[in-house]
Amino acid sequence: NTVYGNVTIAQYAMALLMNICHRIDVLSDMYREACDEHKNVMMGRNLPRQIRQIELYEKTIGIIGLGAIGLCMAKMAAGFGMKVIAYNHHKKTGPEYDFVEQVPLDELLGRADVISIHCPSTDETRGMIDKNVIAKMKDGVILINTARGDIIVEDDLVEALNSGKIYAAGLDVVCNEPITGRIPLMD
């Protein structure tokens, strides 16, 4: 929960996911640079990996942390036709959660095509996403974190990104903020 808007943060998390899936940043630059390249993209010719399109419809999103922000993200994902599963330390009850399948964390890790983190930084969650947890994730998973940077062990994330275990990560937080120099995660 935030002072400046639970919906705003969930929308930002969804925007990170949409940019990963549809490379809006790359395509926007390409459109500005060359009409011919735009035609090649639209015709599906020579589509490089960095602008590969990923369809979200019928994919499974796993939400870690089903508080106000996590619930907003779940609703948005459902609006895109995604199957929504979630893990929360304490099971959530009430009609607003009926569309969410609440599962144990290990099950979420093995089933989710996208994992979006929306839990607070606590003794239990600090360093929670490490190489052991990443190993339980589906190959090629997309990871979104708009919660707290210290929930993910950055060196383990870098290794998983480099190996392809994690296809891409959308982050607006890192372990040590503010960033004062180049960090391996940016490479």
Where are these regions (language model features)?
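Conserved SAM-binding motif I beta-strand of class I
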Residues: 86
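Rossmann-like adenosine-cofactor binding region
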Residues: 89-184
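Residues at the starts of beta-strands that form the adenosine-phosphate
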Residues: 60, 74, 79-83
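Phosphate-binding beta-alpha-beta segment of Rossmann-like dinucleotide-binding domains, i.e.
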Residues: 2-60
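N-terminal Rossmann-fold NAD(P) dinucleotide-binding loop
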Residues: 70-71
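Glycine-rich Rossmann-fold phosphate-binding loop(s) that bind the pyrophosphate
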Residues: 66-67
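Residue in the alpha/beta-hydrolase core beta-strand immediately N-terminal to the catalytic nucleophile
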Residues: 60-62, 142
